Amino acid sequence: MSNVTHQPKIGFVSLGCPKNLVDSERILTELRTEGYDVVPTYDNADMVIVNTCGFIDSAVQESLEAIGEALKENGKVIVTGCLGAKEDQIREVHPKVLEITGPHSYEQVLEHVHHYSPKPKHNPFLSLVPEQGVKLTPRHYAYLKISEGCNHRCTFCIIPSMRGDLVSRPIGEVLAEAKRLADAGVKELLVISQDTSAYGVDVKHRTGFHNGMPVKTSMVSLCEELAKLGIWVRLHYVYPYPHVDDVIPLMAEGKILPYLDIPLQHASPRILKLMKRPGSADRQLARIKQWREICPDLTLRSTFIVGFPGETEEDFQMLLDFLKEARLDRVGCFKYSPVEGATANELADQVPEEVKEERWNRFMQLQQQISAERLQEKVGREILVLVDEVDEEGAIGRSMADAPEIDGAVYLNGETRVKPGDVVRVKVEHADEYDLWGTRV
């Protein structure tokens, strides 16, 4: 006779950035391990967990709407994530929410689930849960979160008030997770955090251990160890500290992907100072030139904010001049919008919305031209492509220069002999502003 009784069903909604996605995966893995069933619909779930985002106003609105929908469809809702740090704001709109916790409060979330839907009696066959845990990404790539929180106090950002100061995960724990993922068939690891290059600062870069060997808790040491897995390793959210220079040779040697996601935010020294960001465009340009000399295939991704309080036409022109000089490969641009709790809200000379829109359009027009020219240089070359999707019309994948969700794609029209997770060599035949088209070699 089975000792499994009712298997409680949990609905789950995950919003926001990849860092939130990793938190969701951790909660789901624990729930599955304890015998809960995770279901894709609200109506037959015993309760619903909503992992929220609260970074910008549109994300707050999306989170509140998701909570409202879960309440309407199910009625029993637990809220966690970044917006959970603002309990009063949630309760004001949705007073019937069962419980609210802040970000990375895994244990609290599980305690609340146990309270409202007690743990089922079951044989904990952990083999029922994949060794790498429950993943919300395709099987061939995964996010590897190395730390939580941030020590910076950028005036446009409220992340430290939600997620706290930097807390680095033990390097042995990070490397063990990476090994499990690689052993499970993951072909690409995307290293993420609020501030990847600060990894280990909070623990004074102390020595940890992996497989009985000492390893320093630092971004560079982490990259050297991850390189031994023989899979793609991609760095995201890299703050432009001086020691970032030390990972470029690893990229040139093919140990990790020649890809750097380094949010620069602006180029005007005055605006960077108002943002509380490091402030020398000339120094950044010199570093970029040096990086490309060491690693010619380096792909640089960055993000910028236009219309920040106090930004003049002269400041904006400095940003455009920087783009022309830097010729970055992948660029995201945001129109500044006030975020509740951000100190930038108190700055003088807020920029009118129509001016933000006009500057954003000029920025994007210039960067699209640069991006198209950069991609055109790849036509005729052979590149490696990681296949993401295959259907009857062909395959879609990404090159080493393309992170999932945020960058471009490589289209292999008519190529149906491959499967997701395959790495194939492709000759590039056509390019536009964002994407490439090619044929398998």
UniProtKB/Swiss-Prot annotation:
Descriptive protein name: Ribosomal protein uS12 methylthiotransferase RimO
Organism: Klebsiella pneumoniae (strain 342)
Coiled-coil residues: none
Residues given in the record as [4Fe-4S] cluster 2 binding sites: C150, C154, C157
Annotated residues for binding of [4Fe-4S] cluster 1: C17, C53, C82
SUPFAM superfamilies: Radical SAM enzymes (SSF102114)
Domain Radical SAM core, first and last residues per copy: 136-373
NCBIfam families xrefs: 30S ribosomal protein S12 methylthiotransferase RimO, MiaB/RimO family radical SAM methylthiotransferase
Reactions accelerated catalytically: L-aspartate(89)-[ribosomal protein uS12]-hydrogen + (sulfur carrier)-SH + AH2 + 2 S-adenosyl-L-methionine = 3-methylsulfanyl-L-aspartate(89)-[ribosomal protein uS12]-hydrogen + (sulfur carrier)-H + 5'-deoxyadenosine + L-methionine + A + S-adenosyl-L-homocysteine + 2 H(+)
Molecular functions per Gene Ontology: 4 iron, 4 sulfur cluster binding; aspartic acid methylthiotransferase activity; metal ion binding; protein methylthiotransferase activity
Compartments (UniProt record): Cytoplasm
Domain MTTase N-terminal: 8-118
